[in-house]
Amino acid sequence: MGIVYEQTYRESLQNPEAFWAEAAKKVHWYNEWDRVLDDSDGHYRWFVGGCMNTCYNALDLHVHNGRGDQLALIYDSPVTDTKKKYTYKQLRDRVAKVAGILANKGVVKGDRVVIYMPMIPEALIAMLACARLGAIHSVVFGGFVAHELATRIEDAKPRMIISASCGIEVSSIIEYKPILDEAIKKCTHKPTTCLIWQRPQYRANMLPWRDIDWELEEEKTRGVDPVPVLATDPLYILYTSGTTGSPKGVIRSNGGHSVAMKWSMDNIYNAKAGDVFFTASDVGWVVGHSYIVYAPLMNGCTTIVYEGKPVRTPNPSAFWRIIEEYKVNVLFSAPTAFRAIKKEDPKGEWIKKFNLDSLRSIFVAGERCDSDTLKWIEKLTKKPVIDNWWQTETGWAIAANPLSLEAQVVKAGSPTKPMPGFNLKVLDEKGQELGAGKKGILCLKLPLPPACLMGIWENDERYRRGYLDQFPGYYLTGDTGYIDKDGYVYVLGRMDGIINVAGHRLSTGEMEEIIAKHPDVAECAVIGVNDELKGEIPMGFIVLKEGIERDHRGIVEGVVALVRQEIGAVASFKIATVVSALPKTRSGKILRKNLREMADGSTLNVPATIEDSNVLKACEKAINALGYPKNKGEK
């Protein structure tokens, strides 16, 4: 096992232009490219001179090829008790009309359009309508506060903003339109038009000189054809989650993105035309862009738009119900979703109630998946669980298990091997390559493959400084890890997840992996805190599985013993506390930085992406009970 993968991977690195030119044959082009790769100025432009349209590849192509009556999109909203289905022809027709609205309001190729929407079909329709015109969409996660929305509007300078009147949470309605109005007031840049989708749960007040009603406008608008764009023209700008200060807008091109999306579906996710693809994420994040919207539709799959949660809508069976009801073939979600399910249903009783025969595989990404969670999902679903590692900046998997190219043996804790085009290396702090098993900084030797960021919007200096300057000739991922003797990648965490305990560099991610093995632990986080004697020491936060009523002190002692047993006394892991939940962003990333800020008594910079600020307050009380911050009495 491994010959096909090894040969393919080697070809992609030795002759990237020939490799990706072959892959690009799966995409429809109006005109082929003049050059496969232009790597001048530190920017990597793929398929230079090529002319195509992303929306055409996602919708019209399937209609023209006789698949217009196949289901393209299923909308399932437990929070509104709504279900809808669209064929490829129906979706194409709606997208064409909405593109007509944009065109009638003056939106042309190269204009930016900010999209501020909940998880409803209209969010995807808005994105595809922009792509149809060659306009550059910038999706902002629905429910972001006005200040965060304003910073993105100010940076992208959109001609139009597309929004909905509201978003629906488990037990509340978030009124989007007042947030949007406040955000625009804060901006020096003013959009000429706001297109508003009115939802029955909340009808927004409209400003007649600026706002137009989407539904009414769509009824009277004729559809427009796709506009040919250059492969190197931007498809979208996506601002990285948790941004503080000025936002960082990742630019994705049209051509390279389309080629990589097609390649990944054909070779990694083993998804064919007609398959049902369920990505439980949000279009506000990169996973949603790539694997709710573009990749499934480009490959002729049926994509599911889910407006709900893994739990509480109404219970931990949500994913399993959808898999049975729609005969889902591939499930893709973040590890945190499965941890939430595991916490409420540790024995998997809900899973047993549903038929999962249609499901072939489960993919997880967005954060490191601990071995215990991976094994739990695998054991109860009896399906292969595939971890994959990537970033907003790359747009698709740096490391994964290419199921249809050649499935590799799964090693728990590893997202398997680097994907073609990603020349992954482990470097020390001086930029020297390290050997097998040596822990260091994960970097990608240039050039980057198609779909990776073209740069940062309107800030080339920030792009170079943040990704290219530290190790010339390499792209800095910002993650640490190692590659074992078999070529398997292990991601230990962000560079700031390495702590220095009495001169020993230790990974908090490795400690989390060990703690997660404890039978009572649902999920955990480890941070480094300042210590007068050792410089830094680790502090653990533990969330227990539902129904665990054992004494917390005994559980903490057991966890401490586990870390000592696996790493040794050198870890100095002695401080831990049980909490009801971990603070997270809405995309499921644990806010370890905020935990450390509270433990060290430094200024707390809470991101706008936080899911529940009350969880942070509860953790602060737990930290105080441990006697931290140590300098509290001095302030």
Where are these predicted regions, by residue range?
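A short helix-loop-beta submotif of the ANL/AMP-binding
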Residues: 99, 112, 118-146, 156-161, ...
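Conserved AMP-binding/adenylate-forming core of the ANL superfamily
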Residues: 55-56, 69, 73-128, 145-150, ...
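Conserved adenylate-forming
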Residues: 146, 150-209, 273, 308-438, ...
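N-lobe entry segment of adenylate-forming
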Residues: 1-86, 90-93, 97-100, 184-190, ...
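AMP-binding/adenylate-forming catalytic domain of the ANL superfamily
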Residues: 192, 196, 533, 565-590, ...
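Conserved AMP-binding loop of ANL adenylate-forming enzymes
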Residues: 115, 235, 256, 261, ...
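Conserved pre-ATP/AMP-binding loop-to-beta segment of ANL
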Residues: 69-71, 194-202, 206-239, 246, ...
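AMP-binding/adenylate-forming catalytic core of the ANL superfamily
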Residues: 140-166, 180, 324, 331, ...
